[in-house]
C-alpha cells in the first residue's frame, strides 16, 4: 500500500499522520514526504526520521496557530504546513508566521463542486487563495 502512490507516479506525498514505514520508503525512493503531526511527540519522530517539514493536522482542531507557535519554539529548524480548518478568513494569520511554508485548505476544492463539475468555481477559489497568499508573501 505504501508504494501505490509512488508507483502511480506521485511526485510527493502528504499524509494525515506520521507512519515511519511510509516516510522511510519515500526517503529511500527520493520522494519528498510531508507527514501529518499534531503534537511534539510526532515532531520528535519526524526529526528522528530526518525531516525538516511536517504537515500540522487537523490544524484548527489541534490548537491552530498558537499550537504551531508553541511547537515551533523548541523545534527551531522545523517548518510546518497546516491543513484542516484553514480557510479564506484565517489563512493570512497562518502565512504571516515564518515557520509556515504553505497552507492547505479544502474550501477551494469542495467535493460538491467536483461532483457538479463546477471547475470554473474551483479555479476562481484557487486563484482567490493564491492572491490571499501573495498579499502576505509577495
Task: List where the protein language model places each region.
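C-terminal helical cap(s) of enzyme catalytic domains, especially alpha/beta-barrels
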Residues: 26-31, 112-138
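Generic secondary-structure signature for well-ordered alpha-helical cores
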Residues: 73-77, 96-99, 127, 131-138
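Glycine-rich phosphate-binding active-site loops on the catalytic face of alpha/beta enzymes
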Residues: 16-22, 55-65, 99-121
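Catalytic cores of alpha/beta
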Residues: 1-8, 41-49, 66, 73, ...
Amino acid at each position: 500500500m505504501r508504494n501505490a502512490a509512488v508507483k502511480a507516479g506521485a511526485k510527493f506525498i502528504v499524509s494525515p499522520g506520521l507512519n515511519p514505514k511510509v516516510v522511510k520508503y519515500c526517503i529511500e525512493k527520493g520522494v519528498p514526504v510531508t507527514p501529518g503531526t499534531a503534537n511534539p511527540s510526532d515532531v520528535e519522530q519526524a526529526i528522528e526520521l530526518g525531516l525538516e517539514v511536517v504537515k500540522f493536522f487537523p490544524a484548527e482542531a489541534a490548537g491552530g496557530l498558537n499550537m504551531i507557535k508553541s511547537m515551533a519554539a523548541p523545534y527551531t529548524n522545523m517548518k510546518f504546513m497546516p491543513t484542516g480548518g484553514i480557510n479564506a478568513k484565517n489563512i493570512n494569520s497562518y502565512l504571516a508566521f515564518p515557520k509556515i511554508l504553505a497552507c492547505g485548505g479544502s474550501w477551494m476544492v469542495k467535493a460538491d463542486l467536483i461532483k457538479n463539475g463546477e471547475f470554473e468555481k474551483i479555479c476562481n477559489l484557487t486563484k482567490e487563495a493564491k492572491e490571499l497568499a501573495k498579499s502576505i508573501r509577495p
